[in-house]
Amino acid sequence: MPIEASSGKMIIYQLLPRLFGNRNTTNKFYGTKEENGVGKFNDINDVALSAIKKMGVTHIWYTGVIEHALLTDYTKFGIPMDDADVVKGIAGSPYAIKDYYDVNPDLATSVPDRMQEFEQLVTRTKSNGLKVIIDFVPNHVARAYKSDTKPEGIKD
């Protein structure tokens, strides 16, 4: 049964993309994304968004989207490795932000195209009549914060 958004009130659906589209139920302690699986931006498709909208939701709060410290090796894409001694698990904590100008490469089907995939998700969400909310907590940073995608002239 849909929730009624009466008198213009927002109804927010919090969504963690790394879990949303993941159909792997292994849940191995300290497991890799290959062992435990990971959801992708593209898993949040028009069918899913339409179903969420039909529940009466007005906004989707995408959590864990900004690039955070993790232990997957993305150095071939210019993303530096994180120190295993300070990362929470292999997948990391979405609140240990490592680059406020980038998105989590685990959530992309193509790491070099991760920002475009995220932008397509935002467009898809809006096309389905929903608004987007993104977590942004400036003091929740990884111990090794260093942007590899910041705009020219911006200092870390």
Named regions from a protein language model:
Residues 1-131, 139-156:
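N-terminal structural segment of carbohydrate-active enzymes
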